Amino acid sequence: MSKATGFIKEFRDFAVKGNAIDLAVGVIIGAAFGKIVDSLVKDVVMPLVNFILGGSVDFSNKFLVLSMPDGYTGPMMYADLTKAGANVLAWGNFITIIINFVLLAFVIFWMVKAIYSARRKEEAAPEAPAAPPEDVTVLREIRDLLKDKQGS
């Protein structure tokens, strides 16, 4: 067998029989789960937070201008300033990302907690004890008969 054929066989064994398939499935499911969590935060949690706080939790347009380009007369918006070359400390965007992270972590925590709780309930369901093997049953009957004989 040539080295190329051996390499191809080795790669096929790795890709098909190894953990590569499990890893690929995990990555695909993880990506899909990420979209679910992202939608849950953006489409459900954030609107509720915005409603409760009475406005938008978006500080991305809060910033501190450290230096302006000479002769700049455009709007004082973050996107316009950075496009013009202004040195801007975007603290508001940082705060918004932190808030989003905390909310996302909170949602994931509750989802995982619910999944583990459901698993524990499944595991906690007691199984009916298995019937003893026939030889054990026969030995118990013999024991009981011997006890009865000794007692009489």
Swiss-Prot record:
Keyword RNA-binding: no
GO molecular function: mechanosensitive monoatomic ion channel activity
Topology within the bilayer: Multi-pass membrane protein
Main subcellular location of this protein, as a coarse class: membrane
Pfam families found in the cross-reference section: MscL (PF01741)
InterPro entries: MS_channel (IPR001185), MSC/AndL (IPR037673), MscL_channel (IPR036019)
Subcellular location: Cell inner membrane
Keywords, in A-Z order: Cell inner membrane, Cell membrane, Ion channel, Ion transport, Membrane, Transmembrane, Transmembrane helix, Transport
Annotated transmembrane regions: 21-41, 44-64, 92-112
Subunit structure: Homopentamer.
Family: Belongs to the MscL family.
Name under which the protein is recorded: Large-conductance mechanosensitive channel
Organism from which the protein derives: Bordetella parapertussis (strain 12822 / ATCC BAA-587 / NCTC 13253)
